[in-house]
Amino acid sequence: MRMKGLYVVPLLLALVESAQKSDLGGDASAALINHSPMLIHRLQDLLQNSNSSDTTLRIRTANSNEVKVIHTHQLLLTLQSDIFEGLLLNQSEVTLQEPAECAAVFEKFIRYFYCGEISVNLNQAIPLHRLASKYHVTALQRGITEYMKTHFASESSQGHVVSWYHYALRMGDITLQESCLKFLAWNLSTVMSSNEWVTVSDNLMVSLLQRSDLVLQSELELFNAVEEWVSKKNPDVPVIEKVLRAIRYPMITPSQLFQIQKKSVVLASYHNSVQDLMFQAFQFHSASPLHFAKYFEVNCSMFVPRNYLSPSWGSQWIINNPARDDRSLTFQTQLGPSNHDTSKKITWNALFSPRWIPVSLRPVYSESVSSSSQSNRLEEGKPRLVMTSAMSGMDFAGVTFQKTVLVGVKRQQGKVFIKHVYNVHQSTDEVFDFLLNADLQKRTSEYLIDNSLHLHIIIKPIYHSLIKAK
């Protein structure tokens, strides 16, 4: 990818452009003659012409005798980097020690100072970001961060988001850390089946397992993936115990719990570490949640479902040509994860409107208002999604329902990646600000895959503590 834009234009050209605009004033006959592309081309030629340079950079790498020599110009380096300004004070030749991966892209990094443009691929993102951070080239640092945040879903043989997270952690880049964590959490099933999974660090694994917004098929899938990670990474015993205790066993069916008790090698070795949680899970499945809540604390993460994609928790909804008209969907979910409620289902109705306008803002029809202006007002409406229970008369004592909507925005190798997650407050049926900035009219919209809107609705029961039985 080639990064180019105003935020990476060299300071020299920005100052020239500002002066030119000032010269025009308000004269209607004035015109701007723009030869900045020619200037950029000539600046790039300077980098190739060592005869005109006034500065020499020598790039060395550890455990190597190779030295890369780059002839540059002090003015262009110091305009954008206070680090170079300090290094080149009263000297024209500097030797720099860089890791091999940074040395490999150093000439590309220097070329950026001459043209304000740089091409980036997945493998080069970290070394270029490291150089931009080290030499305080702020605009380039921001640009590469944005590149990374928009390329999480890009195809990569070994995966790259986990390594980007670990890099952001070392650099103290909180924004990039959170963006990486969010992508990993929302696309965990894909990550768990990739080569990246075994590269997850102990701390990252613990951080992920503490989250309730993980998107995956089931809690059993998560347990199996964690067991694989433990077997291949062989972390310290406290880490193994911590990740095993982060599994939400009540979200696994009794038959599946019996199965992992019998077949799991890791669980057999660390059964004592989770014995209390397994016993509590079987108790949870043996009684009604209402009765269970009288004796046990259910207002904790162990009893909060994650974003499970299996049919009993919700429904996929692919809306073709979503800008065309209103659509509706009816689906069923289980009342809750407790085995006691296996046979109990709830029916839900979902309504999607591509251009909804609140009644209070709708124009009152009259003969004085043209039909075209009424039509234009409708075009100004925003997408709306409402989800309601078709069984509102039922008594759901001790439980409310968290509605979550996943929006898939990109497909790689036939897989839809989740980029947007909307959580609906338990007291309402509407998803506020749903696709607020989406243009569903454009076939190239990032929200559409083959002109279809890919949604997945998840209904999660949230249990509430009741008065304890004496």
Curated annotation (Swiss-Prot):
BTB domain segment(s): 53-122
Keyword Transmembrane: no
Cellular localisation: Secreted
Secreted recorded as keyword: yes
Keywords: Secreted, Signal
An annotated GO cellular component: extracellular region
Gene3D superfamilies recorded: 1.25.40.420, Potassium Channel Kv1.1, Chain A
UniProt domain BACK: residue ranges: 161-261
InterPro entries from the UniProt entry: BACK (IPR011705), BTB-POZ/Galectin-3-binding (IPR051481), BTB/POZ_dom (IPR000210), SKP1/BTB/POZ_sf (IPR011333), TRAF_BTBD17 (IPR056184)
Signal peptide: 1-18
Pfam families attached to this UniProt entry: BACK, BTB, TRAF_BTBD17
Matches recorded under PANTHER family: BTB_POZ DOMAIN-CONTAINING PROTEIN 17 (PTHR24410:SF12), HL07962P-RELATED (PTHR24410)
Full protein name: BTB/POZ domain-containing protein 17
Organism: Xenopus laevis (African clawed frog)
